[in-house]
UniProtKB/Swiss-Prot annotation:
Organism: Cairina moschata
Entry's family note: Belongs to the nuclear hormone receptor family. NR1 subfamily.
Binding of Zn(2+) 1, residues: 50, 53, 67, 70
Major localisation: nucleus
Name of the protein described by the UniProt record: Thyroid hormone receptor alpha
UniProt DNA-binding region: 50-124
Intracellular or extracellular location(s): Nucleus
Residue numbers bearing the Phosphoserine modification: 11, 27
Gene Ontology biological-process annotations: cell differentiation; negative regulation of transcription by RNA polymerase II; positive regulation of transcription by RNA polymerase II; retinoic acid receptor signaling pathway; thyroid hormone receptor signaling pathway
Record-level GO cellular component terms: RNA polymerase II transcription regulator complex
Amino acid sequence: EQKPSTLDPLSEPEDTRWLDGKRKRKSSQCLVKSSMSGYIPSYLDKDEQCVVCGDKATGYHYRCITCEGCKGFFRRTIQKNLHPTYSCKYDGCCVIDKITRNQCQLCRFKKCISVGMAMDLVLDDSKRVAKRKLIEENRERRRKEEMIKSLQHRPSPSAEEWELIHVVTEAHRSTNAQGSHWKQKRKFLPEDIGQSPMASMPDGDKVDLEAFSEFTKIITPAITRVVDFAKKLPMFSELPCEDQIILLKGCCMEIMSLRAAVRYDPESETLTLSGEMAVKREQLKNGGLGVVSDAIFDLGKSLSAFNLDDTEVALLQAVLLMSSDRTGLICVDKIEKCQETYLLAFEHYINYRKHNIPHFWPKLLMKVTDLRMIGACHASRFLHMKVECPTELFPPLFLEV
């Protein structure tokens, strides 16, 4: 009886006998190592067989349809130049199938050659590494090309959306103090203001009443401008007065924070409030906002990388305004549809702008979440301030919203 060959790592124990030059199964307990199941290319027919051993084929390998086992055997044989060492005790007359394929390496190799497997397609290690690198480079190139193609084919705003975008942009520009000239017209809050906290807050922070007084002087016109912005939006003016009030109370601090954040100046490390007062982080913090100040400054620093234009800021404000989850709203569905209309026009405008920042649109939408959190934190902070600070310091409109 022939013993298993040590040359082929896939060799199996001998459990067949030779009759008339052909191998036959000796026992029904003979184990068959079939090719591993896995990804099968779409060009193969169902249950297509390996042309060498008849096992289930996995693809087109070295110019033939073969299984993984015969592919690996042929590759190792050529790479390690093993075929000169192969021999057959039965004059090369072995029948090769999935049961006997590991018993005679010479006949298996001859079968590989006879069915058309190409030796010249087997690469050595260095060529295989180079080929794999080339494949990866081509895959990465195709990925970039597809990404560019998808960006080019993303829809820009429709004519109706352009009209809406124009209205929202003009509403923002006409209610945004100092416009694009804010840097030239801003005045820095004196450094000695906001450095000497006097009134204590329950959370341990201090409030500089002089700085707080300065901020309250600009808060009323800032709130008025947010209200005017909302009234210039057609969808907002169509809502019941009760819903308009709820939406304005909910978004007022969020929109004012956004307007301040987009006027962050990294050189002076200041935010410009209401288009006129430039303040540092500690001044805003000691002036009553506490930790909310850090959130607004951090937002300003992150937004500076986005290079938002007036239209994008305006559409962000419209999305914040039309938030259907505000408590007490009557026309929830209508408001939700309004916000969806703004969001779709916003997304199409982002496509039109073609920003270089990867995943610009989802990253920008996350800023809406940040602004909502700032609004919620400010509401909580404001409740404490009403208790700790003299009531006469609060403007009536500020108390109302």
